[in-house]
Amino acid sequence: MEIDSYPEITITDMLAIIRNTCELYMKYGARSSKKVDYFHEEIIKQLRTIFTDERYIVAQEYDVPSLNPSGKKKCDIVVLRDNIPVIVLPVKIIMTNYKQNKNNYFENQIGEVTGIKLANPTINVIPLNIYMSKTPYLNTNKVITKFESITYSDIAIYEKYKEHRLFSDVINYIIDVEHENVVNETYQKIPKLIGFNNATGYVSLRAIMERLNV
């Protein structure tokens, strides 16, 4: 694959995308797909500047063959070469209540990826996960009951699956933040994004794609 020399997403660009994603979450709520759709679209825009050859297509919400009861899995972002999926990016953006749902997030993702890899042994799976260093835990009324700290140790297990080649690479970003809201307040203010945590430094999509043989 020849990488084209289009401008890549910088650290500043990515932080702006994440900030806009947070704004959409606050405006439309957790159940709305707007924040996820926006984030996916921004990543797809970048991938389309990388995979410019007409053999490649970058798709959103694409059904990839999977060893599961339905025989397929709808994947967030997929790169196809000659109409065959060659890269899958499962995306997760964690806004609240992470540690309560941590095992479910991980086990669901591993199960989905395993089915995809069994049906497509040579496919490249690259999870893209966004976390906040300080994540609010909300009750059913969206009131903050506490803040949870997320550190690299919470997500280090992903590297084990990379070592065993279930993942071709892993994009885990912890964003250092300062929250405007405090405990016992309704969560309704966008946190201030300080930057990428030192443990999960920013790497451009272009650099990651250059490592793949697709």
Language model features with spans:
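Nuclease-adjacent, charged terminal/linker segments that flank catalytic cores
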Residues: M1-A16, C22, Y202, I208-V214
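Acidic-basic catalytic patches of nuclease active cores, encompassing PD-(D/E)XK
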Residues: P7-Y62
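Phosphate/oxyanion-binding active-site loops and adjacent basic polyanion-contact surfaces
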Residues: S32-H40, S70, N101, Y105
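Hydrophobic, Leu/Ile/Phe/Ala-enriched alpha-helical segments that form helix-helix packing faces
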Residues: F39, I43-F51, V113-N120, I150-K162, ...
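Charged, often glycine-rich, active-site loop that binds/positions anionic groups
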Residues: E61-I77
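Active-site beta-strand-loop-beta-strand hairpin of nuclease catalytic cores
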Residues: V78-L89
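Catalytic cores of nucleic-acid endonucleases
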Residues: I93-K146
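Non-catalytic C-terminal interaction segments of nucleic acid-processing enzymes
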Residues: I144-V214
